[in-house]
Amino acid sequence: MGLKQLVLQLVYGHKSSSEQYVSWLRSQGMHIGQHVHLYTPWSIKIDTQRPWMIEIGDNVHITADCSILQHDYSWAVMQHLTGEVLGSCGMVRIGNNVFIGQKSLILKGAEIGDNTIIGAGSVVTGHLEGNAVYAGVPAKKISSLDVYVDKRRNLQLEEATLLVR
């Protein structure tokens, strides 16, 4: 183990690398597929209060400062008024081959279909069909994945010239 990894391990523990964080989440009972990568894992917050309520598929990429929640604490306001704890929770399902952009928030009850891109800073609620690109607050469909692939192909040469200047 190199010096950098040793420092990360001492400072961030199980969040010091993508592999360690994924392994730890699995040990808590979370279902996580193969080839899942957490970029800057120490900045990613994945709710482990009920780990069985979050499912992450294969080939999922979650970037820095993202949060995935399967519950909330809004009941605290109602408890103050009524004395009742009216908790709220919901499954979170992230399909296969999904990219979640930086600083996105995946809320309880969210379901992200296969082959989906979530733009940076998005708030995901409810069901998002697969083979699509979503962004915004709340996340809305921007385009089909096929249209986005064609757009990226068309821009590839133009953007490549920026790299060689």
Question: PLM ranges: what are they?
Answer:
Residues I117, V133-A135:
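Short-chain dehydrogenase/reductase
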Residues H37-E111, V137-P138, S144-D146:
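Flexible, glycine/small-residue-enriched loop-and-beta-strand segment within the central core
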Residues Q34, N96, D114-N115, G130:
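Short acidic capping loops at alpha-helix termini that bridge into adjacent secondary structure
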Residues Q102-G126:
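Beta-rich strand-turn-strand
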Residues M1-H35, W52, N59, Y73-V77, ...:
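Terminal amphipathic alpha-helical/low-complexity segments used for targeting or macromolecular assembly
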Residues H127-N131, E158-E159:
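Short arginine-rich
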